[in-house]
Regions:
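Conserved C-terminal structural/oligomerization subdomain of aldehyde/semialdehyde dehydrogenase
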Residues: 1-104
Length: 104
């Protein structure tokens, strides 16, 4: 199903696109790259496809805005949901650190 809506100004189409409780995805088709960039920044959705639709990749984050969900799936950020990052600083020399508050 494809929904096509006529509009006269970019402000009008942004208002129409954002006038919903949901914001999972949007698709923009235009010959103007600058228009696509402006619209993709202004539309409140978790993913925006430009001159294509439903292209996915496991390294791209996926998730919505508003009532379409909180958080993201996939992508590098998802790895952090399953890990506990920890920083360990270790003196590898045989000498004790001269001042533990000075990083070398």
């Amino acid at each position: 199903v494809l929904s096509v809506i006529k509009f006269k100004t970019e402000e009008e189409v942004i208002s129409l696109a954002n006038d919903t409780r949901h914001g999972l995805a949007a698709g923009i088709f235009s010959k103007s790259n600058s228009r696509c960039l402006r619209l993709s920044k202004a539309i409140h959705s978790g993913i925006v496809w430009v001159n294509t639709y439903r292209v996915v990749s496991p390294i791209a984050e996926f998730g919505g805005f508003k009532n379409s969900g909180y958080g993201r799936e996939s992508g590098f950020q998802a790895i952090y949901d399953y890990t506990r990052p920890k920083t360990v600083w270790m003196n590898m020399s045989d000498e004790p650190a001269s001042n533990p508050f000075v990083m070398k």
